[in-house]
Amino acid sequence: MAERAALEELVKLQGERVRGLKQQKASAELIEEEVAKLLKLKAQLGPDESKQKFVLKTPKGTRDYSPRQMAVREKVFDVIIRCFKRHGAEVIDTPVFELKETLMGKYGEDSKLIYDLKDQGGELLSLRYDLTVPFARYLAMNKLTNIKRYHIAKVYRRDNPAMTRGRYREFYQCDFDIAGNFDPMIPDAECLKIMCEILSSLQIGDFLVKVNDRRILDGMFAICGVSDSKFRTICSSVDKLDKVSWEEVKNEMVGEKGLAPEVADRIGDYVQQHGGVSLVEQLLQDPKLSQSKQALEGLGDLKLLFEYLTLFGIDDKISFDLSLARGLDYYTGVIYEAVLLQTPAQAGEEPLGVGSVAAGGRYDGLVGMFDPKGRKVPCVGLSIGVERIFSIVEQRLEALEEKVRTTETQVLVASAQKKLLEERLKLVSELWDAGIKAELLYKKNPKLLNQLQYCEEAGIPLVAIIGEQELEDGVIKLRSVTSREEVDVRREDLVEEIKRRTGQPLCIC
């Protein structure tokens, strides 16, 4: 403290000296020299931490989750994981941070959103931007050529968050990917089927899945006169068509990205089209587009994809949309994105997209970027945007004023008289050992009314009540919280009766 006080006095004196020199209109060189001394003293002094008010909050773009929010999240995750497992996926995990070199050059214009870490050892690190690039690195490192995997974990982006709309800097992704050499479009169709199954199961509203193909985009841009160097940057402009008008997109391409107006008009003739398999067939006959080998390959695969989607019974949920041009650099084939739709009444006329909730595509070259010999492993996958889904489900539950249980407790062990703590402890231990989710209140002599109220507030369905008479008779009084019906159950039959009432399997092995 004494040392700091001495420094503060020196800063004060030096400040007075600088002010005096300025009043005396001393030479600029002398003033500059004395100002430098003042700044040096201030740097030594550092900030006065005692005067700084610490604001207790989470970092920008992040949030805490309450027990209620976590209960909603667990339900959403459960739907997603059950679907992934139903389709035969294995689960993996990767580090939350990667070598910076691993992530750079994989995301195009979005690379600027990657979080960099300062490591004391000098290693250049970054927080993962998504789960796909780490998966490709994992495949190359382990020399894997065939796997169906899912991965649920947090990713990080230095984006400008809109937290009310489910956009954050730290958020979960739920990914499903199929790696390996297979016949065309079968894995791609399954990914779209999974996407539709999950969105239907979550019951968050009507949705539409837009599909396109990177080869069609590249072929279309080539025949329209876009140079190779502008392919990716024009893609990012076209991809905004779901949010802004064609005129605004055209102005950006011409004004900001230097595209000739006639080239932009030719692009506009294509990217404003959307439809089903009939549009695919129409474009296969397009005299200009058919000059591109890339575009023809993409259209041929999309035609086959629609055949499989019809067999899966989801073709009515899919729209071929030429404006879909997702910005990630690593996509090489089919790309897709699911959007929630407003109803015609909400939208005014036709259904409109109100936000992306899932996306994915084929990335056949990404693993080869990490393999020392450049060996490619074809991959296709999808990612569920769960943060937006959490927000939608939470809003729906609030609107319905629906109570959400935050625990899974099946039974509360209660007592009707005093001095029965030991008996409650013995019984709750028996229930835990039998795999029953049970609780008791942490009081020696709780009132029965307080115990019953706790069950109602927490949504616990059953109460196992111990009394002196019940102990003499070798029974436990089992009470239903909702119906208030009570029955005496022999102690040795209690576990079986609770499992029967709660629908829990009798064997936990």
Curated annotation (Swiss-Prot):
Its EC number is 6.1.1.21. It is found in: Cytoplasm. GO terms for molecular function: ATP binding; histidine-tRNA ligase activity; protein homodimerization activity; RNA binding. The modification N-acetylalanine is found at A2. It comes from Pongo abelii (Sumatran orangutan). Transmembrane segments: none annotated. The modification Phosphoserine is found at S66, S356. L-histidine binds at D130, L131, T132, R157, Q173, D177, R326, Y330, Y331. This is Histidine--tRNA ligase, cytoplasmic. Homodimer. It is an enzyme of class 6 (ligase). InterPro entries: aa-tRNA-synth_II (IPR006195), aa-tRNA-synth_II/BPL/LPL (IPR045864), Anticodon-bd (IPR004154), Anticodon-bd_dom_sf (IPR036621), His-tRNA-ligase (IPR015807), HisRS-like_core (IPR041715), HisRS/HisZ (IPR004516), HisRS_anticodon (IPR033656). The gene is HARS1.
